[in-house]
Structures are given as C-alpha cells and as structure tokens.
Amino acid sequence: MRDNFIKNCYKKILAADSVYDIAIVSPTQFAPKLSSKIGNHLFIKREDLQPVFSFKLRGAYNKISKLKNIKHIVAASAGNHAQGVAMTCQKLRLQSSIVMPLTTPTIKVNAVKKLGSKVILSGDTYDEAYNFAIKYAKEKNYNFVHPYDDLEVIAGQGTIAIELINQLEEHPDYVFIPVGGGGLLAGMTVYLKTINPKIKVIAVEAEDSACFNLAYKNGKPTSLKHVGIFADGVAVKKIGSKTFKLTKNIVDSSITVTTDEICSAIKELYDETRVIAEPAGALSLAGARKYILSNKIKNKNIATILCGANMNFDRLRHVSERADIGESSEIILGVTIDELSLIHI
C-alpha cells in the first residue's frame, strides 16, 4: 500500500508543471568557498530567488490551480506558505484569508497584505494559528489549503528535485533537505529515490522543533511538547501524516542543528552568495556542514536547498552575534560528536 502511495505521489510530481505559470526554474549554484572549506563539491539550490523569496509558491499554486468552484481560500502559515497562497490567489483572481501566528516576522505579514490577502493574526505558534484557520474555514464554508500535508502541495514542492537533477552534471551523492511539516522533504525524497535510490537524502531540523525525529522514534507523527520559534519557517509541532508516510522508510538519515549553527550557516551563505537567508533557509547548509564533519565525508557532490530569505532586518544583529558561537561549536563538534545526535533510518 505504501509503495502505491509513493508511486501516486511521484506521478503527481511529474504532472505538476503548472507551477511554472508562476514560479521560476531556480538555479543550482556551485559554492566554491564552501566547497573548499568542507572538502566536498557543494551546490546550493536557490529557492530564495522565487517571486516570494521561498519555495512555498510551488505547492500553493499546484494545489489551488487544480481546485474547482472556489469561493474563498483560507490558509494557516508562519509566513512563506502564506505568501505563496496570496500570490497564487492574486494571479487566479481569488479571495483569500491567511491566519498567521502573532510571532510571525513583520516582513512576512506585510508581504501577504501587499498581495491582497486578508491577514488574521492568531496564536503564538503555527499550530495555534492552524487550529483557528480550520475552524474559520469551516464556519465560512471556505476552502482550506494545507501548507504541507496535501499530495498536490507535496507534488509542487517535488518539482525542485526535478530541476536539481536536470541542472547537475552528475547525480548528487547527498541531498540535505530542511524539514518543518515535511512537504518539501516528502516531495523531493519521493522523486530522488524513485530515479536513483543511491542518492542519500538527509533530513535537517532545528533541534527545538525536530518533529520528524520524534515521529521516527515513536513510529508515528507525535506532537512536540515545545516548539522553538527562531527558525519560524520550520516551527511545526507535529510532522504531517502524509509526509511521514511518504518519507519514514526512504529518508536515509536525520540530523538536528542548534540556533548557533543555523546563524553560522546564514553567515556562510552571505559570504558565498551575498544573500541573507532566513533561519529555515540556512537549515540545509547547517545540517550539511555538521553531518559532513561528523561523518568525515570527502570529495562528494553535496546538494543543499536555500529554501527562503524572508527575515526581518532587525534580527541581523542577533544572527551575527550567534554566528561566531556556531562556528566555534563546529570545532568542538569534530571531537565530541557521537551517534546519539543522528537517527539513521
């Protein structure tokens, strides 16, 4: 049954070319400085170059463009899915309401408003905003679009993997994928593992919102008791049921990173590309650096996903201060890391 579920998802990914009505084919950029530093060939998939500065546009458009007889779209989001839904609805001339946590960065709230969507701020976390949005959509009889646990959304995100394979001369040895609710992980992993099972897929999570790790330990999606909000784009309490079903047996490994390690990766991305990634956007690189160092990987093709660049400017001082700590911890990490920090799947 699970194999059929994966096959169905793969077919949906291949049929998701409508995303290019609104999204770009983002470039995959070789990173010479980082490659030299880590002793591998490192590539960065630049999803920060999408019109809403995040990959989330793909899944939102793929889902909404297939809906029929729509009255009004409702979504819950910490920011990037919200912008994807808002831009999609603007293009398709649909009305939309977006429920966002009170902690959402102002840059994301304002971007959604500028795209013409109604913004409702509710709750301190994504999950609280989600619960309100579900209730609101039901009361109004509006269509709710899930940010990650929907096959059409997952398929839209999976188009990133198609581009990645087409853009590289050789298949990557490792692909590091950031995880919040698991939509990006599911879409990319299904495609990558279908075309080449030898590609190693590593899930990367912020250590204070590691819902995929918890689900794997328990064998099913399980709610975290606490969710950190520094990496707001992946601050999800519970992995999606569909995303976990698609990924639990085909993702090769999982790793978590600290806030300091994320800040260090933001700095490294700036030094390499002159782009300021949001915390979730730097998650993939942070995980790649930590995993490569701890496993002594050399001379491999490494693919990372810069999945978003929507961060308030006033957070930069905090990021700068923590980045130096993150770099220092990597030196210690090379000596002290043990297998307990990884879940091998």
Residue map of PLM features:
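Short alpha-helical "recognition helix" segments of helix-turn-helix
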Residues: 345
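PLP-dependent amino-acid enzyme catalytic core
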Residues: 1-342
